[in-house]
Amino acid sequence: MGETEEERTSQAGQLFENFIQATTCKGTLQAFSVLCRQLELNPSDHRGFYSSLKTAVTFWKAKGLWGKLDKRAGHKEYSKGRACADTRCLIIGGGPCGFRTAIELALLGAKVVVIEKRDTFSRNNVLHLWPYTIHDLRNLGAKKFYGKFCAGSIDHISIRQLQLMLLKIALIVGVEVHVNVEFVKLLEPPEDQSTDGQGWRAEIRPADNPVSDYEFDVIIGADGRRSTLDGFRRKEFRGKLAIAITANFVNRNTTAEAKVEEISGVAFIFNQKFFLELKEETGIDLENIVYYKDNTHYFVMTAKKQSLLDKGVIINDYIETERLLAFDNVNQEALLSYAREAADFGTNYQLPSLDYAINHYGQPDVAMFDFTCMYASENAALVREKSHRQLLVALVGDSLLEPFWPMGTGCARGFLAAFDTAWMIKGWAQGKEPLDLLSERESIYRLLPQTTAENISKNFEQYTIDPATRYPNLNSSCVRPHQVRHLFISGEQDLSSLERSGQTRRSVSISRRESEVRPGRLLLWCQNQTQDYRGVNVTDLNTSWRSGLALCALIHRQRPELIDFDSLNEADCAKNNQLAFDVAEREFGIQPVTTGKEMDAERGPDKLIMVLYLSKFYEMFHKSTQSVTGLPKEIDANNGDCSSKTANSLYNSINHARKRIPKLDKKLEESDVNRKRKKASSHHEELMSCQTAPPAGEREEQKENKVRSMATQLLARFEENAPSCALRRQSDSESDSDADRPVSLDLTENPRFARPKIEPTHPSTTPDKAKWQPSPYLRLLESNTRSETLHTEHYVESQSSHRLTEIQSECQYSSVSSAYKSSERRPRSPLIPFTPTLSPMMHCLQQLEEQVIQQRKREPLNRKSIKERAQKLSSLFTGNPAQPQTDESSPAVSPSSPPQTIPESSTLSCLLSPAPSLTHKQCSEASETHLKADKHTEIRRVERLDPSKQRTVGKVSSAIGVKAATLAILYETDHRPNNPITLSLTEARRCAESGLVSVRKEFSASLGGSDTCVFCQKRVYIMERLSAEGFFFHRECFRCHICGCSLRLGAHTFDSQQGTFYCKMHFSQRKTSTRHRRGEIQDGGIRSSSITISNHTSTDGTRGQPSGGEFDSSTQQDLQTLPDSKEIISVSEVKDSSKKADPADSAPACPDSPLQKVKRSTAKGEITNKNILWKKKIRSTLPLVLMKKFHRGKPEDKTEVLAEEDGNSDFEEIHESLSSKKPSNPSTDSNCLPTKDNSSTPLDEIPKIPLYRTHVLPEYPKPSSSSPEPIVTSISSDPISFSPKKKLTLSLSEKEKLLNWDLTNPGKSGAEEQQQQHVKPSISLQHDHPEPTHPQPEPAPPLFGFQQWANNLRKSFSKGSNPVVLRRNRPMKARPLSEGSFNVGAVFQDEERCGSLVDEGEARPRTESEIASLLEQVALGSKTSRGTKDDMASLPPRKLNFFSSLRIKRVEGAEQSRGEGQKDILSILSRFRNKASAQQQQQQKSNSSSEDEQEPKLTHSGALQKKKEKIAIRQTKSDELKRLHRAQVIQRQLEEVEEKQRSLEEKGVALEKVLRGENGDDGSTDEAALLQTWFKLVLEKNKLSRYESELMIFAQELELEDTQSRLQQDLRRRMATEDCEKSASELVEEQNILVEIMKVVEKRDKLVSLLEEQRLKEKAEDRDLESLILSRGYQFHWT
């Protein structure tokens, strides 16, 4: 007997092992059948089967599984398997969710039958698993069935493996499984039978299956279909056409395959550069892609239809998706090629072979399907009653809530739904009332769409089927029983009652809003808001608004400081309306729908337009109360659509920094000086608040989680009930956001943050905010900056020959805070230009300038306003005033109007605009135009007129006309706080003579008004009308000019000269091609104008610097001696080709000519002026490193670069001039020697070149020898020395050599390396020669310095052990969103930084204590916020670049050379070294001379270090995956919103045609009813627009988060290397990264604080709304 028992045990163990190891569905069922037969077990005995099996199988491998299952079955909720003892359940579908539900029901004691249509598990598609899902499956013994389950950092599994695993567990716990069985329909009980008669059954195929005779109490649909079970209405979520392709390739498990990194995914909005390169190289256009490695190499991607058509995958284009993707319309061979090519590119061609796996049909495993529409059931369960028999019907899995595949939520949410359903069935078995049961289930179901891995309970051990253990803050009674009465179907209800009851699920707030908010109520509200205003009498919604006063009054009521109502002229209707439109767009984010001119038409404004436009004000300020400052404080909580500035205006302010193209001008905006001063001040406040804040580890993590939670809730609510109040809670507090928010995201756009007067002599004395205390490091800068400014002012004062410049400077120096308000509030007097004779005017101007300078010194805190100065100035002259004429060719243009190209007869020339401020600066780039001067010309600096008030002084003599125009413009600046640009008198005269003063002309009149689409020239109806940059267009017409992709408002860039819009990627390409084209047409030193570009938020003007033939030397001196924080240099626009060809213009200037000086002076500003803010930020954050004064020659820029935003821009970059590249042969330097430079520039007045990423364009043609070329700056320890500048000219062949990464020069010796090391106190990095220590210019010295520079550059490349690997694998610091991509500019980037920052960082040794105290204030936690700069600026050809910015396990190539003696600042940051990532350990540090010394040395703590690295990598990967999924959600939601908007627009167009009688209607339709319908559509459209803005805000936050994570990872990797092994450039790069992180933290801090404030407001409003609803007898619920 003993032997028999032992044999029996051994046999049982072997049979059970066979069952466990089965790899197919059929094999598993067969092994299970054999196991039961051999062990004499009855699988139909569901109650005792598990116990019998556990008793029979006792071998050691099974005991671990029994222990896990026993622990699970021991949960109290199961009541030891008796909770549902008499319940019979049918589950339709054998997917993961169906089996998971079956397991729970079996543990509850229910009889469970699973029917599955197929008998094979063939889907190799990979599922992403949430942490709780992994924990749950492990507790069920997943490792026993599949040993590779989630090994290491793997968090995914193929559907086939998961199904097999769950099938085996289900069989073990007594679930009855039938395959090859198809559900057909429910069979109702016979009507005439007793209570113990036949119950509910299922009709199945084949009919002879035993399941057809079973009766059930519960039926669960889990087959993933949408119509298997009747009674469940569905909500559709339609996005843009989305065609998914899945592909499975054979995984041979080779070493090469194992090394290929998985790709968690890339969303188009997250890494556009990758997709652009993919399209350019392969023609494949994708929106996202994922790669997982399991039994197969699994790829899934979303392809764009046009790409599939172009590649021949889809044969014919059809509108119907079914026909489009029909089998006979798909070329299978092309599809295979398409997917393989995308997979090859995505893995960087690292997979050795891509052979398709074979599916169960014997075909290559690739599929293409449509998921344009996703569906969700409106309810999760219902109860049917027939003949006194009740049946509970429920849905789980995809049948309940279809997932968006890139998110990986299908399995996770499906399991949660399975647990919730099991909980419901337990209540059903215990006799709970059906309505109570359904109401609880619906309450829980409403949480499901918004669940994420972050917002569910983290205590996985406590998870049970009880929802309270899984959902924090669960409210299981938010849906009341009476609200689900329609889900109890007894056959006594008719369809109409069912439909009516279904409406009870709608939000109370929405219903009340729709019943109360009508056009009549809108009119009444407008009347109440505008009463008691002069000239305003609102009696209707059209003619009453014609004058524009009513709109201005409406704005003034809400924000009195925005409009000076008393100064408005009632007769100037167009101006008043345009003013209101501009202010509303700028301050409230309300896009205009028409123009001021059209409002002034005889027929008056269109009523439909006014309803649409005024409704936005109504929603924003409805029943808002005024605070003392006139800001709205509260919002009517009963209005679900009331939302604040947060959604629209906040997003606009965020994107101000994102725009690369400043506008030429805007009306009624702050002056350039004011705006830049405030930006500087705001930056210091943000920076110091960041520095003085406590360590941000916990704080940032909390904020990050809050933001993520807010985003999730927002998206989920929208997903759950598309048009209902899901949007409301995220956007209810718009109107009061300004009053309470601590700091605006972009303080430059908000006049309330204007700084008080900032004197030129005291630029560092800015008033403190309540929240901010100046850092001691900032104080360290004050004396330095003040001394620089004083020195500069004295220098400027000593120049007496050029006076008008100083007058204008003084005007610009006026009070920052008062300039804006005074210009807005004071009445605008008519402009009276004077025309005195030339000599008296100049004499008076000189006298006045001297008086102003003296007064500025004596009374720095009591200066006169601009207006007073202008009045005094005008009083000094005599003569008959010339009456101004309005130039008909330059009509008023709104701030949103697009700046057009400058007329060829009109050329603007610009001079420097001093703006004293501690921090600064709008990037301003310049090109020069060499104009032929007929006589001695004095340069005059004037401020440009606002287009709406530009004057053309009559046809008087040119000199008098110019003087009159000068005074007119000067006086006008008192009321036009636009960006100051400067005009030379020569150009002003030309403008006056031609009758053109406007900088831009209105778009061609042939394009029509606001009802004509600027792109397609077709009619654009009101509801479908969008506006940007003053243009009006259809949504579908708003596309990138290059790639044709759809653009979104706020996420576009605009070229003001060409009148074209671009996406981020192609705007950068546009800049590149523009510079290349300009370079090709340059000739003999003549520079063509740089493109003037603009965006929809920036207001920078185009500034220019003319280069006349004969300029006074004082002019050049004035230009040189302006303080570094005051320089503005820009473009002189010349389009007349005849001028370019003028021999006098093209002739090179003599060495000592003033023209040459002006050229050099102008070029200095081209680089430095863009970078002032950068320099100031660095000096603020790292004062001990960067405070010491140094001087350098300013590089002159041959390359025209575009006017860009300041250093705060998310898209910051600087395009490095060509000469930053070093020729391969230093002998070419002989061709680059410039003429002698007589100019001298004091050190303290030259801004330092800041930390900027560089991009070098290789296509520039060879410039002429007379063209000034940029030079790399030199550094000297002598604080008063001057730097002569030399030209650099490169031939085309030399440029090509520079782009050869494999370039080596064995001729370079180690002696040259030593030369650089000897220049330790002041590293000399020059093009031409060492800098002399005396101020006088010197003749060109020998080539020693330049040769040394070139050698050093070459050494940095040749030292790497593998230059090709360096190109391919080096992380791209300059392109943070595509770290692996190859960037030509990176070749020269580090040397540029070395020339600009190493000298700063090493000007003197720093103590570790000094820097440590500074850096302790910088939050660098691993989970703090992330920030970014744009990665679209440089788009070079792809050179084996890596796949995504989300990669983790990059293997770094060889690094650059390591200079000796560079042991400065970052040596104290060694505490970060233990956090270094695995990349650093894999990085080979070697050079040609000391490779052995550079080898990484393993220490005794190597094992511990590796363990920490693995943990860090896993955590980083997890964080990246979370960001990816959130990005995918945002991307999908944006597409859905766009589709909903398009649907609304179609309805609105049809309705508008009816209202206008364009559809042939006889007019019998009730207009009032139609207007009511129109208004409802308007409200819905406004709501969707706000939601879209909110989604873009969250996308911005996500981008910042991702970038900061990568910056910190890069910093830790670098700090793992000892400082003694680093070169100077590497130390500088570490400093750069640190500053980058600080900037990102600042951005995210602001954004997070604003979003958190918004959340708190919404929470309070929700409580008020709930109280209101309950007090009025409504049942409170959210939908």
UniProtKB/Swiss-Prot annotation:
Ranges of compositional bias, category Basic and acidic residues: 662-674, 697-707, 1133-1143
Residue spans of biased composition, Pro residues class: 1333-1342
Superkingdom classification of source: Eukaryota
Gene assigned in the entry: mical2b
UniProt cross-references to SUPFAM superfamilies, sorted A to Z: Calponin-homology domain, CH-domain, FAD/NAD(P)-binding domain, Glucocorticoid receptor-like (DNA-binding domain)
Gene3D superfamilies for the chain: Calponin-like domain, Cysteine Rich Protein, FAD/NAD(P)-binding domain
Organism: Danio rerio (Zebrafish)
GO CC list: cytoplasm; nucleus
Protein name (Swiss-Prot/TrEMBL): [F-actin]-monooxygenase mical2b
